[in-house]
Amino acid sequence: HIKNNEGATMGTGQKLYKRAKKIIPGGNMLLSKRPEMFLPEKWPSYYSKSKGCKVWDLDGNEFIDMSIMGIGTNTLGYGHPEIDEAVIKTVKDGNMSTLNCSEEVFLAEKLIEMHPWADMARFARSGGEANAIAIRIARAASGRDKVAICGYHGWHDWYLSANLSDDKSLDGHLLPGLEPKGVPHNLKNTVFPFSYNRFDELESLVEKHDIGVIKMEVIRSMEPEDNFLYKVRQLANKKNMILIFDECTTGFRETFGGIHKKYNVEPDMAMFGKALGNGYAITSV
């Protein structure tokens, strides 16, 4: 609802967002892009075009994007000419067919070349989807259902089930006070969070539960300390657990490929996204 005289000071984007909140749950498709996360009532909300590090709102105002560059996806900038040229060519040639696209083979080969520990690769569209695929594969490979996690790994039921045991379980990993409504209760006690750089917490989980999979972000807001990643790798080896590195956020930034290469610790599986497509929907496992 727009109050009296408020519309005179509001931009087109702010007005449109008020309409959106009436018909779209949360107002948009992604929490990270909601105006409430930045500057409520003043955030432009929508863009008309983007290029490099700049965006233009619906009123034509130009901004330098110093926030999150498309939630961390556009490391090469918005509208990169070489990337867009390839995409436009694909659209013109036809981007859908009963047959497969040959590029998936070339990309799989390149990812394996960059990560010699890997044997195969497959693709998805979002980080959450890639994480769900990886969890299913890892559970099958380990023969065990229980997973230890550290970090943010999407919104699928397997991950949010951590809050069925304690609604504070995902504090510091996702959001505080998150209620796992709609998540099947039979998933309770299948996922157990541990804190980054707290190897003792992970050891305790492994001793108390039949953990088959460790899934974690390689780094979060701090660097690994006291050989943390190496210790995790050794524990996984000792207990025959599958170690998965979620590199959707960290991959292709400090290193060409996964940032785990910087620390010389190899996982059994890894996910990549965001920077992998520079704004286009693709992730890999």
Residue ranges and their predicted role:
Residues R198, S204, M216-K239:
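Active-site core of PLP-dependent enzymes with the aminotransferase class I/II
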Residues N264-V285:
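Active-site PLP attachment segment
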Residues E62-R144:
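Glycine-rich loop-to-alpha-helix module at the N-terminal edge of alpha/beta enzyme cores
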Residues F106-V213:
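PLP-dependent aspartate aminotransferase-fold enzymes
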Residues G27, G60, V87, L111, ...:
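Buried hydrophobic positions in well-ordered alpha/beta secondary-structure cores of metabolic enzymes
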Residues H1-T9:
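Short, Lys/Arg-enriched N-terminal segments with co-localized hydrophobic residues
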Residues M10-K49:
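Active-site-adjacent loop/helix segments that line or gate small-molecule/cofactor pockets in enzymes
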Residues P44-I68:
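Active-site and channel-lining beta-strand-loop segments
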